[in-house]
């Protein structure tokens, strides 16, 4: 591959277009500040890139983008399929402003059977590694955990971490409630446990009929040998499998249905685009999810463009099903790229009959329903913003971004400040920030608030002064009373800020719906009715800020207490403390360890093991 770069200062677009090759590749458009605007791929770079500057029939989104282009970069590839993969990598890495982006692009969760001697069944998200077995991907974490609960009931596989498994001396509660066979203490042989693992894998691969026949044979054999307790266990497994099968709308008994199928339904309505994904794994419907790309720069979105972007971003570089059923066509180049990664031929189906037609119709109905719900949600959010604007004496168009701050600690210990963001009519978790408070005295909430506000907005001011692109909030919400708001006003004066401030205090009754609002620049202190849309918006953002602060505080506090618990033991320094935590998987594992187990850790003598054990018990 070959890449061509030119600096914005000397860049001549007409000259650049004249010298472009008629080869496949990827192009990037940049604005005056060097920010990437758009990434695209082409079979013929010269024809594709030149078309942006020679045609006048662009969509509003593309037309707005072209006006801002000041610099272009290209990368030549060997084929259109290779260009498509590279384009997708650039889009994920750069998040260009005018590309179609499906923002929920985290790695999807899997159900994992580990490669341990006694395999662990676990929720997993990340890079797939040998020798573990992975089943999925699943649309969300709940779908994985539901499957784990099902498998626990039927196959009773362990879910504990290896560090816990290796140091147990008695069965845990899961054994008592018949959700685990307690391999940790030898209540099941390795051979029998691995047989259960194979059965679970067979079930997850959709071979339920084969598994049922195997269990029926084992039940009959056990009964013939007068092993009635074992026969009853197999009977219970068969009954549980029957219940699971009856709860699925996918017919896993149909031999024409491959194990892994994805259904994709596209819907477009009133400027919104939705792609509804249904995941069928092992012949079972394991979940579904609706995806909404950002269309704010595209008032007349082309559904096919968005559908193709979803397929590329959702599947390239990730696990793929054997078959994709969709209500839109997938381009040949994209099919080629997907099959090249998959290592075998895939089926792409748009014309359906029979039960597949029913499945796709259900997915389309879900996509339409999701769009309807999104419209209602947006209307509700806009109503809340309109009401807040009236209270603050602002134009509702001037309120897009709210930032809210809260302080959390336990009697001054492990103080954390949180900043949560509400933007584009929704909370934005990826933009949340936590701040470790370092200069304030323990328990001094006012000083902590001063520190976090000064750090955050002082840094934004500095970045803006250096010519960087920054986002200022339209309103800042402070979770606290007059004291905290007074601190915020002081910081505003020091930094020269004029952003509207709103304080939200619990009020004397400390009940939801009875909050007091403080507007420091008008001197107003008042309550809104419990059913006020503006109050509901402020409560939502305030509650999220409180949750984010307290979870961060607890993590910091617990980590400090673990360090303190071991650090107080004579003879245990940082290296030995880390060795103990690594060996036993955390403080609980260290506490559960016997004296003999402690001695096995490098650097821990018999005498020191005795000291550690006595200190923790």
Curated annotation (Swiss-Prot):
Its main location: cytoplasm. It holds the Pfam family UvrC_RNaseH. Residues 209-244 form the UVR domain. SMART domains: GIYc (SM00465), HhH1 (SM00278). Keywords: Cytoplasm, DNA damage, DNA excision, DNA repair, Excision nuclease, SOS response. Residues 22-100 form the GIY-YIG domain. One of its GO terms (molecular function) is excinuclease ABC activity. InterPro entries: GIY-YIG_endonuc, GIY-YIG_endonuc_sf, GIY-YIG_UvrC_Cho, Hlx-hairpin-Hlx_DNA-bd_motif, RuvA_2-like, UVR_dom, UVR_dom_sf, UvrABC_protein_C. One of its GO terms (cellular component) is cytoplasm. It is found in: Cytoplasm. CDD domains: GIY-YIG_UvrC_Cho. The keyword DNA damage applies. GO terms for biological process: nucleotide-excision repair; SOS response. The UvrABC repair system catalyzes the recognition and processing of DNA lesions. UvrC both incises the 5' and 3' sides of the lesion. The N-terminal half is responsible for the 3' incision and the C-terminal half is responsible for the 5' incision. Belongs to the UvrC family. Interacts with UvrB in an incision complex. HAMAP family: UvrC (MF_00203). This is UvrABC system protein C. The gene is uvrC.
């Amino acid at each position: 591959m070959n890449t061509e770069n030119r600096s914005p200062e000397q860049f001549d677009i007409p000259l650049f277009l004249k010298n472009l090759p008629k080869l496949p590749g990827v192009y990037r458009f940049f604005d005056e500040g060097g920010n990437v605007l758009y990434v695209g791929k082409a079979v013929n770079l010269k024809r594709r890139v030149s078309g942006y500057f020679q045609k006048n029939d662009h969509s509003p989104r593309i037309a707005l983008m072209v006006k801002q282009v000041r610099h272009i970069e290209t990368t030549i590839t060997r084929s259109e399929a290779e260009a498509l993969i590279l384009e997708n990598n650039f889009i994920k890495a750069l998040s260009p402003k005018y590309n179609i982006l499906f923002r929920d692009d985290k790695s999807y969760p899997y159900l994992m059977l580990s490669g341990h001697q006694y395999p662990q069944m676990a929720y997993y998200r990340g890079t797939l590694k040998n020798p573990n077995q992975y089943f999925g991907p699943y649309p969300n974490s709940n779908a994985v955990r539901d499957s784990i609960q099902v498998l626990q009931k039927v196959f009773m596989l362990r879910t504990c971490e290896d560090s816990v498994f290796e140091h147990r001396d008695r069965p845990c509660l899961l054994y008592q409630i018949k959700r685990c066979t307690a391999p940790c203490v030898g209540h099941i042989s390795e051979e029998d446990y691995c047989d259960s693992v194979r059965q679970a894998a067979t079930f997850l691969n959709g071979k339920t009929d084969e598994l049922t026949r195997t269990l029926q044979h084992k039940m009959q054999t056990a009964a013939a040998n007068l092993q009635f307790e074992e026969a009853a266990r197999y009977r219970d497994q068969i009954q549980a499998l029957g219940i699971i099968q009856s709860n699925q709308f996918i017919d896993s008994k149909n031999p024409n249905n491959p194990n892994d199928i994805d259904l994709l339904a596209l819907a477009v309505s009133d400027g919104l685009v939705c792609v509804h994904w249904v995941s069928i794994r092992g012949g079972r419907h394991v979940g579904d999810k609706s995806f909404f790309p950002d269309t704010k720069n595209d008032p007349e979105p082309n559904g096919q463009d968005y559908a193709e972007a979803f397929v590329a971003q959702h599947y390239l570089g990730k696990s793929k099903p054997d078959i994709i059923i969709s209500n839109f066509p997938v381009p040949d180049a994209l099919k080629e790229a997907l099959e090249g990664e998959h290592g075998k031929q895939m089926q792409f189906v748009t014309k359906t009959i029979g039960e597949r037609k029913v499945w796709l119709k259900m997915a389309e109905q879900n996509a339409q329903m999701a769009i309807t719900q999104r419209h209602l949600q947006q209307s509700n959010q806009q109503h809340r913003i309109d009401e807040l604007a009236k209270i603050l004496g602002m134009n509702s168009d001037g309120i897009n971004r709210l930032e809210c701050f809260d302080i959390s600690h336990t009697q001054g210990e492990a103080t954390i400040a949180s900043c949560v963001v509400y933007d584009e009519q929704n909370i934005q978790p990826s933009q949340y920030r936590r701040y470790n408070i370092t200069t304030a005295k323990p328990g001094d909430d006012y000083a902590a608030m001063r520190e976090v506000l000064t750090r955050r907005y002082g840094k934004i001011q500095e970045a803006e002064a250096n010519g960087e692109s920054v986002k200022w909030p339209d309103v800042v919400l402070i979770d606290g009373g007059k004291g905290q708001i007074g601190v915020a006003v002081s910081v505003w004066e020091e930094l020269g800020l004029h952003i509207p401030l709103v304080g939200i205090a619990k009020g004397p009754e400390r009940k939801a719906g009875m909050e007091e609002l403080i507007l420091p620049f008008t001197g107003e202190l008042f309550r809104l009715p419990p059913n006020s849309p503006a109050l509901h918006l402020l409560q939502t953002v305030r509650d999220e800020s409180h949750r984010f602060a307290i979870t961060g505080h607890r993590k910091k506090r617990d980590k400090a207490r673990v360090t303190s618990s071991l650090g107080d033991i004579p003879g245990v320094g940082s290296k030995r403390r880390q060795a103990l935590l690594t060996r036993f998987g955390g403080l609980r594992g260290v506490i559960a360890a016997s004296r003999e187990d402690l001695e096995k850790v490098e650097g821990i003598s018999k005498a020191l093991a005795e000291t550690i054990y006595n200190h923790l018990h």
